[in-house]
């Protein structure tokens, strides 16, 4: 703050080498014996190979900064708070493959449309992970121990695991027209089993939509259901501490799927203005959350506790206005309010995704009298997210990052406009192209420094200070878009 200013200087050394390889493949076979029935056989595969390797060191100075007290507004150094060095090391390897085989069917019977399916998943995961972090202050490794050399953080993980999942579902969509309007009713149930934790789940859900006969511009809807999110590998990695504070990762086979009871109500209203179509959409929701797996965001890494130790809720309101000024491209304005909270170790704290408000705008239109020139404007203003110190939790203390603010503008010029309906086809070289656009974009027009994460520094009194890392500021981008 202006009354408690700090001066921070750091020199970095080292490097990081990461590799992320992802492969997808899918095969779908569909059989349609008649207009009301269809069947599909689906097979897919997913493979990821990840390597995160770094050795990064830094030497830092943290000083108390003051003001000179005069009218010159100069600054002076008010005392040394910390001098030290740190070293972060990681060799993390993860290989994962997921194979899926499923059968789906759909049958139409009168006003009913029945969908059903069954799917089998086979998951194989290979992980080797070693991380440690060394802090050195005035030649002493922290924490100081007269008998042993210790580091401030050390983690080891070595796992090979194969699991199987089986799921099935059935749902019925019923459509009916009456004297008061049109109804669309959908109800279904999903079953799932996972052999890793021997968990069998039943998930019912229901939704209804209504369009009144008297004014079909309106549409209202309501949905409710019990939903489960089955954990994947990183969510059931559970840290276990020994007497010296070293961490070994174990896989928690007692983990349960996170649960959510959801209630959602919404409405849409379509109308025309300025000789263009518009739609207003409003939606309110409330979700009761249980069996939550708490997590924290450390820089750009998500760290899970690996246990179901929390419960909470999420509620909010979304308002959206859509308009089409350019054919085939929607402009929109959104306003959202949200509150999500959980009970963490007996303390009520906001969840890491608790963004309490957000306003976003996207507008695109042609310039008057210049149909080849198109303008776009995109802006966002949203609340900051809760954050805390590394290897800490929000129940021990947290703060919010500053609000996110950004404005982008763009200009596009049609070097080759799209052919209008009724116009003859182009000949020659340009006959192979549908349209060609040359664009100029200015990202972060106002050159705002938005915080992405924090670098944490510890002083001689073991007090931690958050030094912000900023996202990219203003950028200019030139693009060429060709449609065939």
Task: State what each model feature region is.
Residues 2-4, 213-263, 277, 284-305, ...:
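Surface-exposed extracellular loop regions of Gram-negative outer-membrane beta-barrel proteins
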Residues 18-197, 281-284, 332:
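Face-selective signature of the C-terminal outer-membrane beta-barrel domain
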Residues 19-23, 95-99, 162-166, 200-202, ...:
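Residues that define the transmembrane beta-barrel architecture of outer-membrane proteins
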Residues 32-38, 108-113, 176-183, 213-218, ...:
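Short loop/turn motifs that connect adjacent beta-strands in outer-membrane beta-barrel proteins
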Residues 38-44, 50-52, 56, 254-308, ...:
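Membrane-embedded beta-barrel scaffold of Gram-negative outer-membrane proteins
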Residues 41-47, 116-122, 187-191, 208, ...:
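Transmembrane beta-barrel strands of outer-membrane/channel proteins
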Residues 175-181, 285-288, 305-389:
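Gram-negative outer-membrane beta-barrel transporters
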Residues 372, 380-390, 413-484:
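C-terminal beta-signal and adjacent terminal beta-strands/loops
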């Amino acid at each position: 703050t202006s009354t408690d200013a700090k001066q921070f200087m750091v020199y970095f050394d080292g490097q990081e080498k990461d590799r992320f390889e992802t492969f997808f493949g899918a095969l779908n076979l569909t059989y349609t014996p008649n207009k009301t029935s269809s069947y599909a056989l689906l097979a897919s595969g997913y493979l990821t190979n990840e390597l995160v390797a770094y050795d990064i060191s830094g030497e830092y100075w943290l000083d108390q900064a003051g003001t000179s007290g005069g009218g010159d507004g100069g600054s002076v150094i008010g005392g040394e708070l910390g001098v030290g060095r740190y070293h972060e090391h990681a060799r993390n390897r993860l290989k994962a493959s997921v194979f899926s085989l499923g059968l789906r069917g759909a049958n139409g019977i009168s006003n009913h449309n029945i969908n059903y399916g069954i799917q089998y998943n086979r998951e194989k995961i290979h992980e080797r992970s070693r991380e440690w972090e060394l802090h050195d202050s005035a030649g002493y490794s922290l924490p100081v121990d007269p008998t042993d050399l210790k580091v401030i953080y050390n983690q080891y993980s070595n796992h090979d695991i194969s699991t199987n999942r089986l799921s099935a579902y059935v749902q019925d969509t019923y459509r009916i027209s009456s004297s008061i309007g049109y109804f669309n009713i959908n109800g279904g149930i999903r079953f799932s089993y996972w052999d890793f934790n021997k968990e069998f789940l039943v998930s019912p859900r229901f939704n209804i939509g209504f369009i009144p006969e008297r004014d079909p511009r309106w549409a209202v809807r309501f949905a409710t259901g019990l939903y489960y999110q089955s954990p994947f590998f990183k969510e059931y990695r559970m840290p276990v501490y020994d007497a010296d504070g070293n961490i070994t990762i174990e896989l928690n086979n007692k983990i349960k799927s996170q649960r959510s009871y959801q209630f959602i109500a919404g409405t849409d209203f379509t109308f025309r203005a300025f000789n263009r179509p518009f739609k207003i959409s409003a939606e309110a929701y409330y979700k009761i959350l249980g069996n939550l797996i708490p997590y924290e965001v450390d820089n750009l890494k998500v760290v899970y506790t690996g246990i179901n130790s929390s419960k909470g809720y999420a509620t909010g309101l979304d308002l959206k206005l859509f308009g089409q000024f350019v054919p085939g491209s929607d402009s929109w304005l959104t306003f959202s309010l949200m509150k999500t909270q959980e009970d963490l170790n007996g303390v009520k704290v906001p969840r890491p995704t608790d963004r309490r408000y957000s306003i976003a705008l996207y507008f695109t239109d042609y310039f008057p009298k210049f149909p080849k020139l198109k303008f776009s404007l995109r802006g966002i203003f949203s609340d900051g997210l809760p954050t805390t110190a590394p290897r800490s939790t929000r129940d021990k203390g947290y703060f919010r990052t500053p609000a996110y603010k950004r404005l982008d503008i763009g200009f596009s010029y049609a070097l080759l406009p799209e052919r209008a309906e009724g116009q003859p086809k182009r000949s020659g070289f340009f006959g192979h192209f549908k349209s060609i656009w040359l664009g100029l974009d200015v990202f972060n027009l106002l050159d705002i420094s938005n915080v992405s994460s924090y670098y944490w520094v510890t002083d001689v009194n073991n007090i931690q200070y958050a030094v912000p890392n900023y996202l990219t500021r203003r950028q200019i981008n030139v693009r060429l878009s060709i449609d065939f």
